[in-house]
Amino acid sequence: MRRIITFILIVAFVSQSHGWGATGHRVTGMIATNHLNKKAKKRIEALLGQESLAMASTWMDDIRSDSTYNYASDFHWVTVESGQTYDQSKKNPNGDVIMTIERLITELKSGKLDRTSEIRNLKFLVHLVGDIHQPLHVGCCDDQGGNKVQVKWFGGNSNLHRVWDSDIIEGTKLSYTELAQSLGAPDEATIKRLQSGNVRDWANEAMTYRTQVYETGNGNLGYNYSYKNLPLIRERLLAAGVRLAGVLNDIYGK
């Protein structure tokens, strides 16, 4: 019984600490798949086999209990103080989401990775492009990306990071396929606009939402907070998927 309780506590901690929840990440993976060109799709399928990008998107969270990957624990996030740029910010010697995405893209483009390393890097990339579009993964303070900001969510205990990772999304009662489909198909102009920037542009964009994210009033969150922020979450998921497709087409589709 003690082992079961310990396992439940570990799962609860992991689920509220890193990335969009499974639904959000899988939405991003599904949208990306829908925007891959034929060559990129074929090459990615050759690497992942029957595993879709949607399913591969959560692998980086799934392996958190494997100590082999402890080195990757800081890859999910970055801290950039308000008023600073990433270049001006203090860097984490263990890495962060920005430098890791940039490194993964460079390594995947090089064509020098063995198959196992390429698959690992691909799965890392799919996950982290999702992470950087969750505004609290580009943190500004010492609150661990909102994990230390305790709030009530429809009367239950939660924290701001968890609200953005999964609480609002779970409130839609939609599967990842239903949520992805509900976002619609962006037109060519929107795709071009979303894919025109780079990783640091994405981080700068995430920083612009800080005021909105932290407007929690007395901390009793529910319908009003969800109503105000669900449209932004939907936009973030769509942008992440389209941009991920752009990166993958650049790596595998030329």
Task: Cite the ranges covered by each PLM segment.
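Sec-dependent N-terminal signal peptides
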Residues: 4-13
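N-terminal, motif-rich segments that launch catalysis or mediate targeting to/interaction with membranes
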Residues: 18-128, 135, 141-254
